[in-house]
Each structure stands twice: as structure tokens, then as C-alpha cells.
Amino acid sequence: MKKFCFLKIEKIKNDKKNVYCYNKYVFFFSSNKRSYFKKKTIENFYQAKIISIKIHKNAPGSFYCGCQIIWKQKKGIPNLYSCGYKIRKNKNRATRIEWEHVVPAWQFGHQKTCWKKGGRKKCMEDKKYKHIESDLHNLQPAIGEINGDRSNFMYGQLNNSVAQYGRCNMKIDFKRKIVEPPERARGAIARTYFYMNKKYNIILSEKERKMFTIWDKIFPVTKWECEREKLIFNIQGNHNDYVYKHCYKK
């Protein structure tokens, strides 16, 4: 039987029920290698990142570029050759996986009082902000350089633009602060924005809503999206209905 823990904290063991408790998480293991997770709370972004590693162990690649990910304990290393990625500028961040907020932290945080007083760091004291920041549905494994370059830029269409990252068709207009993501990520992006809009009232402009509606239709839910959604539900306890409804159609 394979054990798993997020933090090295004292273990409570119940041999009869086969239950292992770490921190505030309870993990149930069965002999058929299927594991069931019951979530009490995810307290912060750090914990969410550690959990996300477990969720994405079998991901088909990095979110935007589709690079193979080599996981080493708490670190993810992208195989840049596997997707033809070309480093634009930041080699250090290009050689590691970071956890990208599809809906950026700035978008759901900048209007808060804590953000106005001290930015994202100050909002670490705000429980509601921390809850949104650590929502697993909004976190994706991305090449660090892409995560940094995307920053808090909004998604959009960039006509006559050239990709800056080799065969990874990610386009960023740094002056206009607009990102055109590769097609492989557009459907998931749209469904994440719709989820965040519904759950946390994240504002969508009419232009964004129309664009995401098109992306949602053109790029349907993938098998991996369904697998990921199920894993997140088992841990976090809620569905992204914009994914879930397509996974179990009768």
C-alpha cells in the first residue's frame, strides 16, 4: 500500500479503517490502489501548490506549451525539448514549473482594501482572498518564464503577432498587456473564467464573455480536464460545473 503526505507532521494511524491523517487533511487508502481524499480546508496558496503536484502527476504536459513535466518531490522540471520551447529571456524560470493562476491574483485582489494597503503580500492576512487564491480549479502547471511574462495580463486575440517561445505558440504583447494563449489551453481557460465568475463574482467584460464562449465551444473538454476535475472535487469538495457537465453526459 502506497502512502502519501503533504507535510511531515505527526501521523495518526487507524489500522482498521486504513486512515492516515496529515495536518488538516484526511486520506483514505484502499487495497485496490484507488485513493479517496476528504478535504477539511486548504489554508493558503503554499498548501494548494503542494496538493496540485499530486493532482498533476499524470498531466499530459505543461498548461500552455504542452512540455513534458518531470516531477522531483516538490519540484516540476519542464522538458523544453519535448515541446520545442525556446527561452525568451529568463533561463532560470524557464527551467522550472510554477503554478499559474489562470485568473490572475491581481484580477480578484486589486480592488480589496488589503491590496490597496500593501499589494498581494498584505492580502495574505485576508481569509477570503486566501481562499480564492488557493482554489485548485484555478491553478495550472506552467513554465516559469511563461508564468512571469503573462503576469496579470488579460487574454485576447493578437493579429499578426509572432510567438516568442519557439514552437510554443504563446503570444504576449507587453505594451498592450494582452496574451494570446495556444489553442491547446483556450478551452480550459474559458471554463476556468466562467467558474471563477460564477463562484467568486469575478467580473467579465462583454468582450471577454463572447471570446470565452467561442473558445468553450471550439475547444471542448478533454479527457484530462475530466480526470483533473474529478481529482480536485475529491480534495476540494466542489465541481467546476463548466467542465463537470461535459464529463458525464448520458
Swiss-Prot record:
Enzyme Commission no: 3.1.21.1
Q: Where is the signal peptide?
A: none
InterPro entries assigned: Endonuclease-I, His-Me_finger_sf
Catalysed reactions, as listed in the record: Endonucleolytic cleavage to 5'-phosphodinucleotide and 5'-phosphooligonucleotide end-products
Q: What class of enzyme is it?
A: hydrolase
Q: Which UniProt keywords apply?
A: Endonuclease, Hydrolase, Nuclease
Organism's domain of life? Answer: Bacteria
Q: Which terms does the record give in the GO molecular function aspect?
A: deoxyribonuclease I activity
Q: Which PANTHER family match?
A: ENDONUCLEASE-1
Concerning its family, UniProt says:
Belongs to the EndA/NucM nuclease family.
* Known function: Has double-strand break activity.
In Swiss-Prot or TrEMBL terms, this protein is called Endonuclease-1
